[in-house]
């Protein structure tokens, strides 16, 4: 069970230098996005049984349901008659790195009444991103879902999602809310905000005080995998000709979770991280965050 943001992504990659105050040739693409929706799509595409809950504008609710269904996700989307679907304009640099301009729109209006009855009845895992903890209305939903998951004995997985949003909230509060989650997937910047360390191995080790499995994503430097009581393990990135890094971390998370959901406690964690790195490397070679 995944709950969180759904967005309309607009990807903009200038061709050559930017001409301030005038026209700049660019490659522009519109794609479905949203961190939680992307992660759900990759989990389902790679074999997991996934239900997703979120809120979108009524005008394109059918489009987003169809896009998620295309990857195998059972989409429970509330259609908001008064707000647009969240939108992100993503400026892609020549090296594939991104700068994002975000209007979360209908995502910010998600509420408990949008969750269908019995949504967690058949779930084994609840997966949330940090975006669901960033605003008071959403935080209420996130904390309620976490309480329900814990009372039912469900595992929880967390992707902190955004260093900028984490910096606006209290990192200590986020750690407290998500304490005991089975898996956490911060990137380097998010991990640094959460634990105040600069070294990725130290970040990962510190985070195992709160989570059972920690995977610190390092982009082209791969990732660090850590579990309590054992030295962190470095997993290298797969080489790739990067055109657009949008969704690479989401694909990594979804791929790792697909292996963990399939194999449970028997999961070969380094092999799962290596598989996730391979999937993420495929994503950066093209535009868009979802499976083709």
PLM feature segments, named:
Residues 125-202, 221-223:
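Conserved beta-alpha-beta core of the PfkB/ribokinase-like small-molecule kinase fold
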Residues 20-22, 45-128:
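Conserved N-terminal subdomain of the carbohydrate kinase-like
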Residues 1, 148-151, 200-292:
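Conserved phosphate-binding/catalytic region of the ribokinase-like
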Residues 1-53, 62-63, 242:
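Glycine-rich phosphate/adenosyl-contacting loop at the front of the ribokinase-like
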Residues 50, 75, 156-157, 214:
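Hydrophobic beta-strand scaffold residues
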Residues 6, 131, 251:
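Active-site metal-binding loops of divalent metal-dependent hydrolases
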């Amino acid at each position: 069970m995944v709950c969180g943001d759904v967005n309309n992504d607009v990807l903009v990659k200038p061709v050559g230098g930017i001409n301030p105050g005038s026209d700049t040739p660019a490659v522009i693409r519109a794609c479905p996005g949203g961190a939680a929706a992307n992660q759900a799509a990759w989990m389902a595409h790679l074999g997991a049984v996934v239900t997703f809950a979120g809120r979108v504008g009524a005008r394109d609710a059918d489009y987003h349901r169809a896009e998620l269904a295309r990857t195998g996700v059972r989409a429970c989307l509330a259609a908001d008659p008064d707000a647009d679907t969240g939108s992100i304009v993503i400026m892609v640099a020549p090296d594939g790195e991104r700068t994002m301009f975000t209007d979360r729109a209908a995502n910010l209006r998600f509420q408990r009444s949008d969750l269908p009855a019995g949504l967690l009845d058949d779930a084994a895992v609840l997966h949330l991103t940090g975006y669901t903890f960033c605003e008071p209305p959403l935080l209420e939903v996130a904390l309620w879902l976490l309480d329900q998951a814990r009372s039912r004995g469900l595992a929880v997985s967390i992707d902190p999602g955004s260093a900028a949003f984490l910096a606006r909230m209290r990192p200590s509060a986020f750690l407290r809310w998500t304490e005991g989650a089975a898996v956490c997937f911060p990137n380097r910047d998010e991990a640094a905000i959460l634990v105040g360390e600069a070294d990725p191995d130290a970040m990962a080790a510190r985070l195992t005080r709160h989570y059972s499995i920690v995977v610190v994503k390092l982009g082209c430097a791969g990732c660090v995998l850590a579990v309590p009581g054992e030295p962190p393990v470095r997993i290298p990135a797969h080489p790739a000709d990067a055109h657009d890094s949008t969704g690479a971390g989401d694909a990594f998370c979804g791929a790792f979770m697909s292996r963990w959901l399939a194999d449970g406690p028997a999961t070969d964690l380094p092999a799962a991280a290596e598989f996730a790195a391979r999937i993420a490397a495929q994503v950066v070679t093209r535009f868009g965050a979802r499976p083709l």
